[in-house]
Amino acid sequence: MAIVPKRKTSKQRKRKRQTHDALKVSTLVSCQNCSVQTIPHVTCKSCGFYKGRQVLKVKSS
């Protein structure tokens, strides 16, 4: 025999449990060097700067 729930899960209980399943909106900050929107605590992909100093060499196009 399979395991069966003893009581029906109410809409309120189900929805309260599902409140944490939503995707979070990621925050963006502007780069101090080139003012491009980037993810915080990550090297800027357009200029290669992180915390005011050059970390990556970026090919200029």
UniProtKB/Swiss-Prot annotation:
Q: What does the UniProt keyword field contain?
A: Ribonucleoprotein, Ribosomal protein
Q: Which GO terms describe its cellular component?
A: large ribosomal subunit
Protein family: Belongs to the bacterial ribosomal protein bL32 family.
Protein name (record): Large ribosomal subunit protein bL32
UniProt GO molecular function: structural constituent of ribosome
Q: Cross-referenced InterPro entries, in alphabetical order?
A: Ribosomal_bL32, Ribosomal_bL32_bact, Ribosomal_zn-bd
The record ties this protein, via Gene3D superfamilies, to: Single helix bin
Query: According to its UniProt record, what is one Pfam family this protein matches?
Result: Ribosomal_L32p
The Basic residues compositionally biased stretches are: 1-18
Q: Which GO terms describe its biological process?
A: translation
Gene that specifies this protein: rpmF
Write out the ranges of the annotated region (Disordered). 1-20
